[in-house]
Amino acid sequence: MFAGLQIRKVLALTLACATLLIVSACAVFQPADPNGPRSNAPQYPIGLSDVGTRLEEASLAWYQLSQRYGVSGKTEANLHPYTGTLESLPANLPASIHLPKVGDPSKPTEADTREALRRFIVEWQRLIGAEPDELSLVERTDEPTGIKVARYEQRPFRYPLRGGFGNLTIRFRSDGQIVGLSSNCIPNADRLQAALSNLTPQVTREQAVEQVRNRQNLAATAVVEPQQLVVYAQPAKAPQSAPTSGLEMRLAWEVNVTNGPVTKVYLDAMSNEIIATL
């Protein structure tokens, strides 16, 4: 009888423990919230990383490259205030900068020239502000003066980049001497793309057309055609204590207008603001 009592106590204790475990598990594995996870909304507009740090990094890159090319260490780079990229080469450099030599220097082919440009971009990418695989050559021309020009567009995002940024121009002589270099590419674009990919447009294509037509007071004869979503880069509003606070990236609808006072409108796809017209 005593043994039976002990067995019943053990069974009761086991049952109590099992019940406690089941209740605890139910408390941990709550049903999913039908409204989705409760988290803070992503920051918007998406700002470029601290431009001050970027300017310091670019200044160091210029110093290192200028030493490699025999340029005086006292020469300072002309850096873009918003992107920290090389806006122009300093005037009156004490030494020349050349494209890398590819093929026969006396008779370079167009393929040789493009390969030399590619190698130059790889070497100067910290000042250019773009990864080589983000850049597409959109124009290669020769001016009447003999100066050769190569123009590139930066295409780092899922959507096209607008706002006048993401451009690289290299000017050089037939012997490969660089006479001009200008970039306003977006540095660290991969980090920005990660943030942009989390955005879901809050304005539909049809709503964008309606908003543009109403806000621009377009005539009935005007034709409004939404083209595509784009990433629009524009200077952020700087605090009074600073000359600039870098760039902001916005997801926007690019809308073409025919027979109207403007030809193109950029409507923020998140905030429903008109951010630019052309």
List where the protein language model places each region.
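Segments that shape or occlude catalytic/ligand-binding pockets
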Residues: 28-278
